[in-house]
């Protein structure tokens, strides 16, 4: 999935719906930086977390 993510896309973390919608900032070597509405910028390991496109 992470190979399809590009900066600017809107995503949601199904394990943490309370984070709200996030905008992908960058994708580098499996690490996805996302700026979520409710918690701010989070770096996610794309090998361990599956994000949903909004």
Q: What positions do the PLM features span?
A:
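Basic/aromatic-rich interaction segments and small domains that mediate binding to polyanionic partners
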Residues: 2-54
């Amino acid at each position: 999935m992470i190979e399809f993510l590009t900066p600017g896309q809107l995503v949601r973390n199904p394990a943490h719906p309370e984070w709200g919608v996030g905008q992908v900032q960058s994708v580098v070597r499996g690490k996805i930086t996302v700026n979520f509405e409710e918690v701010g910028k989070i770096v996610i390991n794309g090998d361990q977390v599956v994000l949903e496109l909004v």
